[in-house]
Amino acid sequence: MTHYLLVDGYNVIHANASLAKVAADSLDAARKKLCDALCEFRALSRYRIIVVFDAHLVAGGIGSVENHRGIKVIFTKEAETADHYIEAATYKLARKKQDKITVATSDTLEQLIILAAGASRISAADLWTEIETTRKTALATHKNSRPIKKNPIESLIDPETAQILENMRYAK
């Protein structure tokens, strides 16, 4: 079973105070930071992540699909909102009964629509909480699973050689 996470990009950016501040200066930088956070989350959670950004106000925009370190990044075409794209993708993925779909958005209407399609939802704020919790858990697990072992040279050489080296160390 594949577990998809569809992310309403700008909605999730603006749910994070530090990213919203970055977005005020540079949407490109905010999008990159979001995608980087989602890439790390994908590696730890095993979701297949699709993040969707509105480009519906871009005159003549044809839309695009990019791969950013293992996540699919969608820029919608002119006159297509991220919400519309996410709804259509949710319905398409929901036809495969074996797949699980979660949509990250804080848009109430969007949540109702995707719930009706058979997907689950997570608010943008809750997604940030899950990302941070997953990261902290992985760090703690990694730290605890690899005890630091000292491997002093004394354990690798015979006592006679150790004594010779010790004498050399203190010789003047």
Placement of each model-derived feature along the sequence:
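Nuclease catalytic cores that cleave nucleic-acid phosphodiester bonds
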Residues: H3-L5, N11-K172
